[in-house]
Each structure stands twice: as structure tokens, then as C-alpha cells.
Regions:
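C-terminal PAP-associated
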Residues: 21-496
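Preference for short coil/turn "hinge" residues that link or interrupt alpha-helices
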Residues: 10-11, 419
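Bacterial N-terminal signal peptides that target proteins for export
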Residues: 1-8
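Hydrophobic h-region of N-terminal signal peptides that target proteins for export
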Residues: 11-20
Length: 496
């Protein structure tokens, strides 16, 4: 759809601000703001240090292009760790954006992901919700959703997409589009992808995908799991949450154990828990869903740093695939209310029996005086060292007195029982997705998306790569861009 068919930016921001402030429907699809754009034109502190302080490298602008980008993901090739691939949403354009680096994250190139033909007269479509995984053959698999709509006629449907790159993420010639669902109350949301990269696994290079098949909160919704044994050419699909449950679930993530075990965790909105299921036959069959932990925030929360989009609650999990003492241990993380009932904090739990039981939730971030929010965590277990790494947004450096400003912080644990303190600051400059030096609303901020729904982290052989939405350059003059301002960018940093 051409820019001339969309609203001018001033009208866009006023529309998004009003709709965000008045929207009390917590189950609006997370890509709704992007759709609207196109349609209209605490507790006890973390324990002491577990290792020396990490060394954080330079902050690198990965996207470096017009318009806002948000909602980031990153992965790497375990057989060539300098080959890294990432992705993000493109807010003012229709396709997804892919990023690749062949030098360990020092420099990056970008590419658009394929979209299918639109449906109907004057129809169009767009992509959202990036997730990526390498297999052991060097293929990159990039999953996302496609949302179809007719101009002025509402949503025509959604479907899943998995694109494959054979050159490290530089190009994605085609994609497999599947699981189409039609109707405004039926949509596929929040796909996450994983690959079995265990060299001795009987399911090596299987591709796994999870998402929530939302259906207006009816029992026909629920968490879907798809498996591919032919490198993404085809997928078989099963439901892995309670098939008799209310179907009010979101943000499932698949992850793989050291012997090819398949795990998935998600936010059970109705039960207000972080839920879990497992498969020991390569994703063919699953057991009965169980609970990792109860929580206080059911779906999302409007904290000052992300008050318009609101911070989604989701699990980020991984398994120890190293040969170390905790091989096979599972780790999960999530955001929830701090003990003061006001701020948000990051929690983790682990399991040594393949998810049959879990440890009591443990805080990750430093205990600080004052009011501090933490949100949008991502957890990655180093498959070589077994160390557990986590990154998250944190408002501890806010100078507005309103918890508007964020930085990305990082922590590390050898076993998930104690976390590196003090946490390490990753960002060299803070972001503010609320105002621009006190000016509110600000045309340099995409209020409908702000930080998106998550950020990313990947760790391997003692090195971690964090990726996030960054607005430090939001007011920089960018001639020829829609707002003539840089707005949100995708940044990354290497942590050793």
C-alpha cells in the first residue's frame, strides 16, 4: 500500500494515542497497532556475583534505515558462531526485516522478507512477530505471521510464514505460508521457532514452531505446535495446551533439550500461570500441560516506559545442552509484579527432571532503592559453557522521575540459583519511548508499538549477543524518511 493511502503522521499519532488510552480490551492482537497504521494510512535481591563482570562491546545500529523498527530477535550458527541473523518488525512498511552479520556482529546487512499475494480487491498484507533459528546445515529459518486485510473492509485473515535462507540470512528467496485462518476473531499470533541442533540427536535439524491460534477467547483457540522434518518444506500441527480449556493463551516458545527433547512454555492468561508441556519423540506427541509458576499479571501491564502499547507477559526459556554439571537443566524466565505490587521485575525458575517440577521463582535484577521497572527479558543458555544469560529493559537510570527512560541490562548465572550482581549495563545511551526531551506527544515516537513485544539474546561459547529496540537517535534528522526523523532503530552489542 502506498504512503499516499495512509494518514499523515500527525493524524496517526493522535489516533494511536487515543485508541491506546481508551482500549480496555487486553486481548487485542499484539500486531493491532501496525494494522491500524496500515488500515488508516521489591522481593529479596539477587545473590552475589557468580563470575567476573562481563565486558560489553560497542552498541551497533543494525537497522540504520527510515521509519521505526521494533520487536527484535537474534540467533547464530553454532557451527560458525560469527554468522548471526536477526529480525524485527517494520512499522511503516509491509514486510518483515531480516539482518545478517558474518563478522560476529560488527557489521550488518538488511533484507525484506517475502509476503504472499494479497486477498481480494484493493487488499494488502503485512508481516509481524519475528523469530529465527539456525539448523546444523547453516540454514536460517525465519518465522512470522502474515495479516491480510482489505482496504476499508477489515481483516481478511492471518497465516504463518517460515522463510528459509541458505546464505546466513542475507537473502530469503521464498517462504512456506500455511495455517490460514479467516475472520476478525480468528488470528494466528506470536509464532516462535526452534531447531534441534544437537549433533547426536535422533531428531537433528527438525524445525519446531509454536503460536497461539486465538479465536475470540473460545475453546477452539489454544497453543499450536508444528514440526517439520524436511527443512521447513512442510509442517504437521497439533494443539499442546488443554484442548478443553478456554483457549486464552499467548506467547508460546519452543526449546530443545540435549537429547532432542522438545519443550514449550507459554502464558496461560486464564489460569494466570506460566504453563509448560513436553515431547520425547521429536514433537509427535505431547504430555499433559503443567505449571512452571503462578504469577500476578495475567496478560500485559501498562508501566510508564511502555504505557501505550503495554508490556506483554511471556516466558523465555532454554535448556542446558552443554556437557557440564547441569546438562539437561531447563530454565524459564518471565516478567511479573515486584513484591511492592507497583513495579515489574524479572523472575526465573529451573527444572532438573525435564519439567516435572520447578524451583521457586528467583529474582534476577539488582535490588535498588527507589522505583524501578524491568520488563521484556530474554534468556539464553550457552550450549558450550552451560552458563545462563539474560537481558532485559530496566529503568534504573531514568532522569525524568517518571520511569520513562530505559536501558538494556545483562546478567549471568552458572546454575540459575544466583545471578551476577551488579547487573551489567549494555546500552551506552538510554531510550525514551514516552516523550522527546519533555515534548509529548512526539512525532519521533511510534506510540502504537514503542518497544514492540520482546527483545532478544543469543549465547554461545562464552559470548552473548543482545538485540533491542533503541530510540537514542529518534530526533536525528533523516531527510527523505516519512517523518524526517530517525525514530526507533534496532541495536545490538556483543557481551563477553
Amino acid at each position: 500500500m502506498s504512503f499516499s493511502n495512509r494518514l499523515v503522521i500527525a493524524a496517526l499519532f493522535s489516533t494511536v494515542l487515543v485508541s491506546a488510552q481508551n482500549n480496555n480490551n487486553s486481548f487485542t492482537p499484539r500486531w493491532w497497532a501496525k494494522y491500524q497504521t496500515l488500515l488508516q494510512n521489591g522481593a529479596g535481591g539477587a545473590a552475589g556475583p557468580t563470575s567476573s563482570a562481563p565486558a560489553v562491546g560497542a552498541n551497533v545500529d543494525v537497522s540504520n534505515e527510515c521509519g521505526p523498527q521494533s520487536e527484535t530477535f537474534i540467533t547464530l550458527n553454532t557451527l560458525n558462531a560469527k554468522s548471526i541473523a536477526g529480525g524485527s518488525n517494520e512499522i511503516f512498511r509491509d514486510p518483515m526485516r531480516g539482518y545478517s552479520s558474518s563478522d560476529g556482529g560488527a557489521t550488518w546487512t538488511g533484507v525484506d522478507l517475502p509476503l504472499p499475494p494479497a486477498i481480494g480487491t484493493n487488499g494488502t498484507d503485512f508481516g509481524s512477530d519475528p523469530s529465527l533459528a539456525f539448523d546444523t546445515r547453516g540454514n536460517v529459518f525465519y518465522s512470522y505471521i502474515v495479516v491480510f486485510f482489505g482496504h476499508g473492509n477489515g481483516i481478511n485473515g492471518t497465516e504463518l510464514a517460515v522463510a528459509r535462507s541458505t546464505d546466513g540470512g542475507k537473502t530469503y528467496p521464498s517462504a512456506n505460508f500455511f495455517s490460514f485462518s479467516s475472520g476478525s476473531n480468528h488470528f494466528n499470533d506470536k509464532p516462535m521457532i526452534a531447531a534441534d541442533t544437537n549433533l547426536n540427536s535422533p531428531f537433528r535439524d527438525n524445525i519446531y514452531l509454536t503460536w497461539d491460534a486465538a479465536s475470540g477467547g473460545s475453546t477452539s483457540g489454544g497453543i499450536r505446535f508444528a514440526r517439520s522434518t524436511d527443512h521447513g518444506a512442510s509442517f504437521s500441527i497439533v494443539r499442546i495446551d488443554n484442548p478443553k480449556g478456554p483457549g486464552r493463551v499467548i506467547a508460546a516458545q519452543p526449546f530443545v533439550g540435549p537429547n532432542g527433547e522438545v519443550y514449550a512454555a507459554w502464558n496461560d492468561i486464564a489460569a494466570n500461570t506460566i504453563a509448560f508441556n513436553s515431547s520425547f519423540d521429536g514433537g509427535v506427541t505431547f504430555g499433559t500441560p503443567s505449571v512452571i509458576a503462578s504469577k500476578s499479571i495475567a496478560f500485559d501491564i501498562g508501566i510508564p516506559a511502555i504505557s501505550f502499547r503495554r508490556a506483554l507477559i511471556y516466558p523465555s526459556c532454554d535448556a542446558d545442552r552443554s556437557s557440564g554439571p547441569h546438562q539437561g537443566r531447563l530454565y524459564c524466565s518471565w516478567t511479573d509484579l515486584a513484591s511492592n505490587g507497583v513495579n515489574t521485575d524479572i523472575f526465573t525458575a529451573f527444572s532438573d527432571n525435564k519439567g516435572s517440577s520447578w524451583s521457586a521463582p528467583q529474582r534476577v535484577a539488582d535490588s535498588l532503592s527507589g522505583s524501578v521497572d524491568r520488563f521484556y527479558q530474554w534468556l539464553s543458555v550457552d550450549a558450550v559453557t552451560g552458563e545462563v544469560n539474560i537481558s532485559f529493559y530496566d529503568t534504573r537510570n531514568d532522569t525524568t522521575g517518571q520511569r520513562f527512560m530505559t536501558d538494556v541490562y545483562f546478567s549471568r548465572s552458572s546454575d540459575g540459583t544466583s545471578w551476577l550482581s551488579p547487573n551489567s549495563r549494555v546500552t551506552t545511551a538510554s531510550s525514551n519511548e514516552h516523550d522527546c526531551n519533555g515534548v509529548f506527544p512526539c512525532s519521533a515516537i511510534d506510540y502504537g508499538n514503542q518497544y514492540g513485544d520482546y527483545e532478544g539474546l543469543v549465547s554461545f561459547n562464552g559470548i552473548s549477543h543482545a538485540i533491542w529496540t533503541d530510540s537514542r537517535d529518534q530526533l536525528n534528522f533523516a531527510p527523505g524518511c516519512r517523518t524526517n526523523l530517525a525514530m526507533e532503530e534496532v541495536f545490538t552489542a556483543t557481551i563477553r
